Amino acid sequence: MTLILASQSSGRAAMLRAAGLAFETTAAHVDEEMLTASLRAAGQTPRNIADALAEAKAVKIASRLPGVTVIGADSTLALDDGSMLAKPETPEEAADHLRRMAGRRHRLFSAAVAARDGAPIWRAIGEAKLWIRPLSDAFIADYVAQNWDSIRWTVGCYEIEGAGVQLFDRVEGDPWTIIGMPMLPLLTWLRATGLAPQ
């Protein structure tokens, strides 16, 4: 059976490769901004939005490829005041996000949904709590300048597996959820369905 990751995230692909899985990647091209805005307007939580985005990606690809198992994944970031941050579109927006998060806790929700024949067949959502230390404007400017090419694709403006680890005072949650996918539940399910080695 073929396994497809419906994501352009290098971090998610690296996690699956490191786990020894055979898979292909295909971008789903879901309008995440529009879907998120619609779900927020309907009163959905950041947790549910991560799940809905992951499902939309998986179902979109799975509906075109009969019999193929597709994994969609997405992450959302919520500040303690309930506001959500999206992927930054410019270095200036990344710096603004980091200023908003500095000295505060935020929650990161990472969802994975498996779909086959256009319908979801499995899902999991992980949650991590992260505390970003106080950051100076000079540190933020240097960090964004040095890491823009990688952080532009992340909701929190960091890759914790790289230079982003310098941002944090404290982290609660598994590292895979922070990188972008609830890997342990996913691997358990893939083994149970024969898509990963026992």
From Swiss-Prot:
Matching CDD domains: Maf
Keywords linked to the UniProt accession: Cytoplasm, Hydrolase, Nucleotide metabolism
GO cellular component: cytoplasm
Recorded GO MF terms: nucleoside triphosphate diphosphatase activity
Catalytic activity: a ribonucleoside 5'-triphosphate + H2O = a ribonucleoside 5'-phosphate + diphosphate + H(+); a 2'-deoxyribonucleoside 5'-triphosphate + H2O = a 2'-deoxyribonucleoside 5'-phosphate + diphosphate + H(+)
Pfam families: Maf
Chief place where the protein resides: cytoplasm
Gene3D superfamilies: 3.90.950.10
InterPro entries: ITPase-like_fam (IPR029001), Maf-like (IPR003697)
Active site: 74
UniProt subcellular location: Cytoplasm
Cofactor(s) needed by this chain: a divalent metal cation
EC number assigned by the record: 3.6.1.9
Domain of life according to the entry: Bacteria
EC top class, as a word: hydrolase
One GO term of the biological process aspect: nucleotide metabolic process
Primary role: Nucleoside triphosphate pyrophosphatase. May have a dual role in cell division arrest and in preventing the incorporation of modified nucleotides into cellular nucleic acids.
PANTHER family named among the record's database cross-references: BIFUNCTIONAL DTTP/UTP PYROPHOSPHATASE/METHYLTRANSFERASE PROTEIN-RELATED, BIFUNCTIONAL DTTP_UTP PYROPHOSPHATASE_METHYLTRANSFERASE PROTEIN-RELATED
Similarity comment text for this entry: Belongs to the Maf family.
HAMAP family assigned to the protein according to its UniProt record, in alphabetical order: Maf (MF_00528)
Protein's name in the database: Nucleoside triphosphate pyrophosphatase
Record organism: Sphingopyxis alaskensis (strain DSM 13593 / LMG 18877 / RB2256) (Sphingomonas alaskensis)
High-level lineage: Bacteria, Pseudomonadati, Pseudomonadota, Alphaproteobacteria, Sphingomonadales
